[in-house]
């Protein structure tokens, strides 16, 4: 009986998914025929962008520095704060329960907001400029790194930690000496990955006055100077390439155990490895201190106690009429539109990313082909999601369909990278054995590779869906549907009651997605 029931669970799940996908696509007005009929607009735009104005190159180096400065300072500061407070969120470490609940509530609230919304809020506190952007990146990094770190701590071997506690050691020093060495490689790897993400986020914070290259990028797109837009995107692509290959090197160093042994003071570490590890740490410290010293100070000239009081009063007293409204401009409809945009965009991106991942690794294709597709994926990832929105809106017009196209392309870049990492980590033995038996590569992949990577693929898709929910919430800024436009308009008009209702809706939405993801 149980076997018969289990046999129907998978087909039923796929049918349910297809029904949800169709309903979400219909709700967002997806029209492939419209996109195909107007694809010439996209090709003309792409042709202009792919002929960059190289004479404009020197003028964007300083804004790019500010973008990198915000990314470095925010990532390092947020990660350091996360490392300090994350043990309080781990259930297995038995810190005070009130501290764990308070920390998890704070992280849940902060994770609900994309970096762009945090940056806009920061401009009301610290004025325009890179300090507001750095503060937003710090909060964004702190929220994500804290969650990842206390989850890693919960899965770590806590026997050494418990032994130190039983010997009278305090909990935090016990965490430093017993748990941190085990989770440090994952912590550093997550920080490197988040740094790359933060570079893309920092490149659009100028849209809300938080400094960086985003203000110039928006200006050139608005003026239709697409040759200069191509120059900016080319520079961002080169930056992402440098970060990508640097991350690969540092990840290899981390996984080799050099950094962990250096922190633990292991005498087994060779002199050459010790010097190399110290040089890497010294380089990171120097870069961080330089970026911190070059940070522009906050501008409190437009910040007053009365303004902060009005902001706090409005955010804590949401507009309940708007919150419960079922009209097309009400919160419920806008949140539903945001969910549908994320569902369709993530699904399309995942469907296209799976075959691209196989073409992106040398395990399944020749090295030159893998290198070519790797460059394409990095180019896709180097463009901020709002830029895709501004490009697609000239093809499909304003509306939710533009948001779907934007998130689909963004999902391709990130999911292909995640899927490729999964493929490179599998055991190739079964696949090679089937090939040696004369089996065609396609069925060999289906029977030997897909069973190994299916859980990791599903986790990556769910993670990307969680990210897309937040990114879809700001796509309205460029007319791509969702809750973003009403939220940003409410904040710019100091309508804090309405902004409070929208922010509360976002918190509940992300919280609900987290609950569903945890039960996968």
What is the meaning of each model-derived region?
Residues 35, 47, 92, 96, ...:
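Transmembrane alpha-helices and adjacent helix-loop boundaries
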Residues 23-33, 119-126, 196, 290-299, ...:
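A structural signal for multi-pass alpha-helical bundles of membrane permease subunits
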Residues 61-69, 103-110, 196, 332-340, ...:
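Alpha-helical membrane-interface segments at transmembrane helix boundaries
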Residues 107-141, 377-408:
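Generic hydrophobic transmembrane alpha-helix motif, especially the helices
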């Amino acid at each position: 009986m149980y076997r018969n029931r289990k046999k129907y669970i998978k087909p039923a799940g796929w049918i349910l998914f297809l029904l949800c996908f169709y309903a979400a696509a219909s709700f967002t007005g997806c029209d492939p025929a419209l996109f195909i009929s107007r694809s010439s607009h996209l090709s003309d735009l792409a042709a202009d962008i792919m002929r960059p104005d190289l004479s404009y190159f020197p003028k964007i180096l300083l804004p790019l520095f500010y973008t990198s400065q915000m990314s470095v300072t925010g990532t390092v500061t947020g990660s350091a704060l996360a490392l300090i407070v994350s043990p309080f969120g781990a259930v297995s470490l038995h810190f005070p329960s009130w501290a764990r609940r308070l920390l998890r509530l704070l992280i849940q609230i902060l994770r609900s907001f994309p970096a762009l919304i945090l940056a806009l809020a920061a401009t009301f506190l610290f004025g325009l400029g890179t300090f507001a952007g750095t503060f937003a990146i710090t909060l964004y990094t702190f929220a994500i790194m804290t969650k990842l770190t206390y989850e890693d701590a919960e899965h770590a071997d806590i026997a050494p930690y418990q032994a130190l506690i039983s010997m009278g050691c305090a909990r935090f020093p016990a965490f430093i000496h017993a748990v941190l060495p085990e989770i440090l490689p994952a912590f550093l790897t997550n920080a490197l990955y988040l740094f790359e993400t933060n570079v893309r986020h920092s490149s659009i914070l100028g849209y809300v006055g938080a400094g960086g290259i985003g203000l110039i990028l928006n200006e050139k797109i608005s003026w239709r100077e697409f040759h200069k837009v191509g120059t900016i995107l080319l520079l961002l692509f080169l930056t992402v390439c440098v970060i990508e290959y640097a991350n690969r090197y540092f990840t290899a160093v981390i996984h080799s155990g050099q950094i962990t042994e250096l922190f633990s003071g292991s005498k087994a570490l060779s002199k050459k490895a010790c010097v190399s590890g110290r040089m890497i740490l010294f380089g990171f410290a120097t870069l961080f201190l330089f970026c911190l010293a070059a940070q522009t100070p906050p501008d409190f000239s437009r910040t007053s106690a009365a303004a902060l009081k009005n902001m706090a009063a409005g955010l804590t007293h949401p507009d309940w009429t708007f919150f419960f409204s079922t009209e097309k401009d009400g919160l419920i409809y806008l949140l539903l539109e945001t969910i549908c945009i994320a569902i369709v965009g993530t699904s399309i991106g995942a469907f296209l990313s799976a075959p691209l991942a196989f073409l992106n690794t040398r395990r399944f294709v020749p090295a030159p082909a893998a290198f070519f597709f790797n460059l394409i994926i990095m180019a896709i990832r180097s463009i901020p999601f709002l830029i895709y929105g501004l490009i697609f809106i000239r093809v499909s017009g304003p509306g939710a369909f533009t948001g779907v196209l934007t998130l689909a392309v963004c999902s391709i870049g990130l999911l292909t990278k995640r899927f490729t990492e999964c493929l490179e980590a599998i055991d190739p033995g079964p696949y090679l054995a089937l090939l040696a038996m004369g089996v065609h590569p396609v069925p060999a992949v289906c029977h030997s590779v897909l069973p190994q990577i299916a859980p990791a693929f599903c986790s990556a898709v769910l993670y990307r869906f969680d990210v897309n929910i937040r990114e879809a919430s700001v796509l309205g800024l460029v007319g791509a549907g969702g809750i973003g436009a009403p939220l940003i308009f409410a904040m710019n008009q100091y309508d804090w009651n309405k902004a409070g209702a929208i922010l509360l809706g976002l918190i509940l939405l992300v919280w609900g997605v987290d609950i569903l993801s945890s039960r996968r």
